[in-house]
Amino acid sequence: MVKRSFPLLGLNCAACAAHSTKALESTPGVQSATVNLASATTFVVYDETQCTPEMLRAAVAAMGYDLRIDEPEVGELEVLRQREERALQRKTLVAVILSLIVMVLMMWPPMTLPKSLISAVLAAVTLIWAGSGFFVRGWRQLRAGAAGMDLLVMLSTSVAFVYSLYHLGEYLFIAPEAHHLHHLYFEAALMTVAFVLLGKVLEARAQRRTSSALRRLMGGQPKTVHQLLPSGEVITLPVSEVEPGMELRALPHELFAVDGEVISGESYADEQLISGEPIPVAKVAGSEVYAGTLNGSGALVYRAREVGRATVLSRIIRLVEEAQSSRAPIQQVVDRVARVFVPVIVLIAVLTFFVWGLLSPADGWEHGFVAAVTVLIIACPCALGLATPTAIMVGIGRGAEEGLLVRNAEALEAAGHVDTLVLDKTGTITEGRPEVKAIRWCSAEENTSYATILAALEERSSHPLAGAIVRALGVSTQGVAEPTTFREEAGRGLEGVVDGVTYRVGQRAFVEELSGALSAEALKALEEGERSGATCSLFARSGEVLAVILIADTIRATSAEAIASLRARGLEVIMLTGDGPSAARAVGEAVGVSRVVDSVRPEEKAAFVEGLQKEGRRVAMVGDGINDAAALARADLSIAMGSGSDLAMETAMVTLRSSDLKALERFFHLAHTTLRTIHQNLFWACIYNLIAIPVAAGVLYPFTGYLLNPMLAGGLMMLSSLSVVTNSLLSARRQR
């Protein structure tokens, strides 16, 4: 399956997005398609053996939309959109000027024939030139059975124009004495086009700000780089020509061009673009550097490792693009409403016309006509369509700036329903760098010989702590017989036979199967170690525990504060660990979690999460290691810490580039703020249409004698969609 994002131009409202989505998903070979109205893009997953980009383009072309299938250079698409925006601004300016002229003519009595003819000509010019896009797209939508905003504009303006033209012709050729010049609505048709175009210009400007975070990420990609040749000469070449293995030079205060490893030099790097952390990171020989991050005051030579689309920055940009194009589950309801919105509005307009005409034969048909046109003008599927995607774009973009990488909109919505947070201890609550604090020998025999045997066994182990134990022992294994048999049990320990003697290293239950009951000395060392919060591993042979190994991981300085904030949000925070009860309880009490679950083996983590879900809980799992991947995949919301493995990050719905748990609290704040903004936007969009459409139909006329002017309706329609975009932009401040 191919996953690809395409620019989709010509979208005007929620109905446009809904119908184009349906057309794309109906194309053979397409597994899924999402259309983002705010970013004017579509993200399609399709089988390239059954479907081609040309087929996708043809699927939406029939409805008047332009799907760009060529691969644009960086910034090329932005230039194209700016060009279209300038063309839209020119049309808007002309439409507004002509509308003002006509409005003055129509409002300055008496309404003479020359004024009417001038108004008709100016209205025709505006509709044919400035409003041509609405008519072309509206006609195509009508033919394709995919009614959208363009169709509403086409119907309302053409009906008003033709109606006015009819009365003008009647006055000229049939009954000049009938004074029908007072039944002309050229200004309504003109002002409708002007208001809609003006609204589109303002929306485009506001929507550009919703994607500002993504543009800042893209701006972190330098265009050129300094290559250091074997001869010592330095040349400048485009970043696109850099290959892995090349030696590059980073001058002071210069952006790193690709991911790589420092060969020589010392400096600091500002990695806030990648991690969200403002503190500069020291860079020396062997340190990793990342594309888009800023070198400090020192010069560095580094070897290119990941280039082009493989860099961390490029992966982040792709992730953000995909996430911003994704649909929240609530958007599916909006899409269903959008598909029937325009046909329902047209039906309401027709009913309005006939109800007025039948109930008030004297002047009802005239009032009915005005009310029907006003209904067509004031109805706004745009606000409905922009409510969710603009909020998501702002939220996900803001998160990316802070090092919170959200894979899709579902993650934001899932965060709003989570009630239980499961934290893996190692690497999440703690630093993830356990060290051997002490080795308490319990044997009366020479410890050195056993130390070399323990070192020989640990050298063959794949456990992350094996190296730390070998370093803590500080003995040479030369001259020690190779273990004749060796095996490891995940989550329990290892067993090996040296010189015919069987040894075990690991958890108490595993070791006691060989050693029997612990001696008083071993039990005392074990209890003291666990009370201090250390993880204890036992080393034993048949019938005897030889040593107790105390291993401890430093608790992160901010863990307790972050957990307190998370609990204040109403979350139950559970710490999951493979440590024994005493050690686990000591860490849990230190950071203030709601509940501690100890002695959990790696393969049991997913089952524990599933058990919570069976209790009716919505679970978020936070982890950083390979052994967390299954639990992350099982959780309702999966979150990988920045220090974690690639597998954990691939599995997770959210990746925190920082290893600080306070980033987790920031994510939940971001998610809740984004969801609140979506609900506010949808509430406003729905309330606007529920109130505006009946008022436009004339429901207040029997009580107040007031009938809404079509020009005022156009202004309200413009403000409704603009208010939704503005509210989404303001949410960026609330997310800080």
Where are these regions (language model features)?
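Juxtamembrane coupling segments of multi-pass membrane pumps/enzymes
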Residues: 177, 190-252, 283, 406, ...
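ATP-driven catalytic headpiece of P-type ATPases
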Residues: 293, 419-462, 492-574, 653-654, ...
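Conserved catalytic phosphorylation-site environment of P-type ATPases
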Residues: 274, 333, 370, 380-457, ...
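Conserved ATP-binding TGD loop and adjacent catalytic N/P-domain core of P-type ATPases
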Residues: 1-2, 18, 406, 500, ...
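Transmembrane helix-loop-helix hairpins at the membrane interface
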Residues: 87-224, 336, 343-344, 368, ...
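Conserved cytosolic catalytic loops of P-type ATPases
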Residues: 28-50, 54, 183-186, 215-310, ...
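Membrane-embedded alpha-helical bundles of multi-pass transporters
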Residues: 108-112, 143, 162, 398, ...
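Flexible metal-binding regulatory segments at protein termini and peripheral loops
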Residues: 1-116, 207, 216, 233-236, ...
